[in-house]
Each structure stands twice: as structure tokens, then as C-alpha cells.
Design a protein with these regions (language model features):
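Electrostatic interaction modules used in gene-expression and signaling proteins
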Residues: 156, 172-268
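Winged-helix/helix-turn-helix nucleic-acid-interaction surface
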Residues: 100-212
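A short alpha-helical element within helix-turn-helix/winged-helix DNA-binding domains
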Residues: 68-86, 99
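Basic amphipathic alpha-helical segments that dock to polyanions
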Residues: 81, 92-105
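N-terminal, well-ordered alpha-helical segments
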Residues: 51-55, 79, 97
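Short recognition helix of helix-turn-helix/winged-helix DNA-binding domains
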Residues: 1-73, 125, 184, 188, ...
Length: 268
């Protein structure tokens, strides 16, 4: 990246320029580039103000600016950008710098630091200095692939949460049945352990790995509860054996609970 001396070179500026050069070699429609970044904006840490500024930048460009061999340069004045975003000058500069630092836009600086540009009769940019949106074109494939991965992980997380919910309800049903029928066994300790395990339930936006660990914890604990439950019913029964067996059958039916059976309730 060529620096004219008035802007201090940084690694982030260099990376942004590399993305801009890569974007110039591609032909990515403006709508595709903008849709790609919008779909993952929150996931990569962009704030609403960042997205608003990107929209203002994009609105200044034309479709032909995104063709191969060209760069979508934005030379809009600060006044124009402030009017379209509602930002103060300081806020505008701060978010523009952030977009550069994360490699979404680049600076194309004139020798005096002023933004300006010129189009020919066909509307193509002949010469321009300002904010360069070519990095968005360069990273469109990256962001589209990221969105696919994010959606797949979300589907996996939803499935794991349903499984955790089912296992949790099986455990609760057995503990409640044991308490109701005063079954012999370490039920007080198991109930206390279950309450502690519930405190380890993941919050929102947990990773697949965290949910897998949680499912393993609950599945292992379910085996302990089922073992205690089976031991209680393997001992000689009194005159209430038939009633106790009905309780066992009722709780065992909870194993047949399916995700569709609880889909209307909050999982985990």
C-alpha cells in the first residue's frame, strides 16, 4: 500500500489494502457483497452503526463500480455521510476506522487527504479517492461460507437442546416418582445432585461443544437415576407392588418422549 505520509501505516491498513486489491480482480454484484456481510454482521462483531455506515457507503456506489478491474470508491463528503447516518463527525470517523481495521473497507488516499472522484459519460469511475469498498467483494465468498457454517451450527445446537430437554424430563419424572412412592435409595442425594446439574444448563448462544458436554453430563446422571430406580423395584415388594409397577410403567413411558412432543415448550 502506498502511503503519502499523512496517514500512519498500520498492519490493519495493509491488510485492508490487500483485500481491496483482491476485490478488484473479481466481479461481485453490489447486492451480493452487501447481503453477504449483512448476514454475518452480528456474528463478526459489527454494531448497528457499522452496518448503517456500510449502507451509506454502498448507496453512493453504482453497479458498474463492482465489475472486475474496478473499485467501488466512495468520495462522498462528511456532510453527506453525516446526513445519511445521523452521526457526528467524530462518530463517523470512528466507525469508518473500525471498518478498515476489520478489513471491510480500505482507504484510498489522495496526496492532500481529500476525497474526490470523477466519472466518465458512461458512469464509470475515471479517478477517485476516498473509502474503498473492494474488500467487501473480496470477502463475499468468505462471508457466504461463514453464514452456512453458522446456520449449520445453529441447527445442531437446536437438536442438542431438544435432546437435553428430553433427558432432563426423564430424570425429573423418575425422581418425582421415587419421592411419591417413598422408594428406597439415595433419592435425596440424587435430587440434590440433579438441582446442581440444572445450574450447569447452558445459556443462550452456547457452542456445539458446550452443549455436547452438557448432554453427556445429563445422560450419565440419567443412568445413575435409572440404576437406583431399577434397584428399588428389584427388591421384594409389598402389597402395593401392583401400584408401584404402575408408577414404574408410567415413568418408563417418559422414555418415549420425542422432540415433537415438547416442541411447543422452551427447551433447556
Amino acid at each position: 500500500m502506498a502511503h503519502n505520509g499523512w496517514r500512519k501505516p498500520t498492519p490493519e491498513l495493509s491488510v485492508a489494502e490487500q483485500y481491496a486489491q483482491a476485490g478488484e480482480r473479481l466481479s461481485i454484484p453490489r447486492n451480493r457483497a452487501m447481503l453477504a456481510i449483512k448476514k454475518v454482521a452480528t456474528d463478526i462483531g459489527l454494531k448497528p452503526a457499522d452496518r448503517m455506515l456500510l449502507d451509506a457507503f454502498s448507496g453512493f456506489t453504482k453497479e458498474q463500480d463492482w465489475e472486475q478491474g474496478r473499485r467501488p470508491i466512495v468520495w462522498a463528503s462528511n456532510e453527506y455521510l453525516m446526513e445519511h447516518t445521523g452521526f457526528s463527525l467524530a462518530t463517523l470517523r470512528r466507525h469508518a476506522r473500525h471498518l478498515v481495521n476489520v478489513g471491510l473497507i480500505a482507504f484510498k488516499d489522495s496526496s492532500n487527504g481529500k476525497r474526490w472522484g470523477h466519472r466518465d459519460d458512461q458512469g464509470y469511475i475515471v479517478d477517485a479517492y476516498g473509502y474503498d469498498l473492494a474488500p467487501l467483494a473480496a470477502r463475499a465468498d468468505e462471508f457466504e461460507a461463514l453464514y452456512v457454517r453458522i446456520q449449520e451450527e445453529r441447527r445442531m445446537c437446536q437438536g442438542l437442546k431438544k435432546k437435553i430437554t428430553i433427558v432432563r424430563r426423564i430424570i425429573r419424572a423418575k425422581l418425582d416418582a421415587a419421592a411419591e412412592k417413598s422408594l428406597t435409595g439415595p433419592w435425596t442425594k440424587l435430587t440434590e445432585s440433579f438441582e446442581l446439574l440444572l445450574q450447569r444448563l447452558p445459556k443462550r448462544n452456547e457452542s456445539v461443544e458446550k452443549l455436547l458436554d452438557t448432554l453427556d453430563w445429563f445422560a450419565s446422571f440419567k443412568e445413575q437415576v435409572e440404576h437406583a430406580f431399577d434397584r428399588a423395584f428389584s427388591k421384594p415388594q409389598n402389597d402395593n407392588q401392583k401400584a408401584d409397577q404402575q408408577v414404574l410403567d408410567s415413568v418408563s413411558n417418559s422414555h418415549n418422549t420425542t422432540p415433537s412432543g415438547v416442541s411447543d415448550e422452551t427447551h433447556i
